[in-house]
């Protein structure tokens, strides 16, 4: 919603600016699923086990903070508008418990919040403005992600 609104130079409409969500880049759960698949290939013990892949608990951001950070790339004065809505009861705090993934398969997220925001905003800005080849940018972001994982000595990356 944000990116489409900002591409049209409009403010995104939000209901609950102080609600917290488990924001993450698509590469985070993808790395978890691929790591899990490689472990299942080696041993069927984990086959059928459910896992959550998400951000660390200390990487929480509320909606307003995320929007303010994401919108910097789009250079908007008023990136959001708060609307009243009683039609959508929502929890103020949503989070994923990734402790099982950390403990059983030694997986943890790679990106810090600021790294996730930079990657997402850059990708969408490029998508809408066609400044560089999107495939090239995507592959470059994957390389950066893998490099971070390797530098942080995550087992699936080494």
Where are these regions (language model features)?
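Catalytic strand-loop-helix junctions within cyclic-nucleotide turnover domains
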Residues: 57
């Amino acid at each position: 919603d944000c990116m489409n609104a900002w591409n049209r130079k409009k403010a995104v409409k939000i209901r609950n600016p102080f609600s917290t969500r488990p924001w993450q880049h698509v590469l985070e759960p993808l790395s978890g699923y691929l790591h899990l698949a490689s472990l299942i290939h080696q041993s069927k013990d984990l086959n059928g086990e459910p896992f959550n892949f998400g951000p660390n608990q200390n990487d929480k951001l509320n909606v307003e903070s995320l929007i303010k950070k994401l919108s910097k790339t789009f250079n908007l004065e008023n990136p959001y508008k708060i609307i009243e809505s009683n039609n959508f009861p929502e929890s103020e705090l949503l989070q994923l418990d990734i402790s099982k993934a950390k403990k059983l398969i030694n997986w943890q997220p790679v990106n810090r919040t600021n790294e996730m925001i930079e990657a997402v905003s850059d990708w969408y800005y490029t998508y809408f403005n066609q400044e560089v080849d999107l495939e090239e940018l995507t592959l470059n972001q994957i390389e950066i992600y893998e490099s971070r994982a390797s530098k942080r000595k995550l087992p699936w990356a080494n």
